């Protein structure tokens, strides 16, 4: 469960009663797509003939460019998550990251789903002794990609939703891990 019971109005679009502008919604979608794309090879190495996660990332970006409607991007996200379901480990998490990225068009808060699943994919791809450091590096890499205009919003949201995102954004002591 990556979505909170109580929505943050800063992550609800203006047309739905929140304060999130379309421009910032687009930035969140692009960032989520970047996070998912960064780990996509962990899926494609295992499932080279399945392009559903790649198409989901492409649809997320196409939605930002107004080339596809929200429902098309969201549907592509569902197909990517369908590609994830029969798998295990890094490939599964990478496909889920792509699916979450495409669903940002529908619900902006899926941005952290894409980021969290990407971090989990990296962690699942390495030996347990290397896991914490690999996940920390991925988290920091993601934060380095954040557009300045939404950086504080995303970092605050990571802090707020860390517990429901498998604690990948901060250690169990509440401190930021990256």
Predicted regions span which residues?
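C-terminal binding/interaction regions
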Residues: 20, 124-178
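Structured binding/interaction patches within domain cores
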Residues: 1-139
